[in-house]
Amino acid sequence: MKVTLIAIVTCAAVLVLHTTAAEELEAESQLMEVGMPDTELAAVDEERLFECSASCEIEKEGNKDCKKKKCKGGWKCKFNMCVKV
């Protein structure tokens, strides 16, 4: 009787762990499908870098502190480059 009970509890625990791992794997695969390809991310980074540098150069010529207005959405301008905050 004890052996049967232990076997049932063990099988139930393995089933729960397997189901949890499968759900995590499915969630990760869905996140990967939604994200942008690396080439698009690189283009966005280059665009942010250019906007920040151009904005900074314009403000420096006017003898103003370099307050970046182009770096938004979790980015800030530092040393003429947009960096992730």
From Swiss-Prot:
Domain of life: Eukaryota
GO cellular component, one term: extracellular region
Prodomain residues: 23-48
InterPro entries: Hwtx-2-like
Entry keyword Disulfide bond: yes
Main localization of the protein described in the UniProt heading: secreted
Tissue specificity remark: Expressed by the venom gland.
Pfam families, A to Z: Toxin_20 (PF08089)
UniProt entry keywords in alphabetical sequence: Disulfide bond, Neurotoxin, Postsynaptic neurotoxin, Secreted, Signal, Toxin
The keyword Disulfide bond is annotated on this UniProt entry: yes
Disulfide bridges in this chain: 52-66, 56-77, 71-82
Subcellular location: Secreted
Matches recorded under SUPFAM superfamilies: omega toxin-like
Signal peptide bounds: 1-22
Transmembrane portions of the chain: none
Family assignment from sequence similarity: Belongs to the neurotoxin 12 (Hwtx-2) family. 02 (Hwtx-2) subfamily.
Role noted for this protein: Postsynaptic neurotoxin.
Protein name per Swiss-Prot or TrEMBL: U4-theraphotoxin-Hhn1c
Organism: Cyriopagopus hainanus (Chinese bird spider)
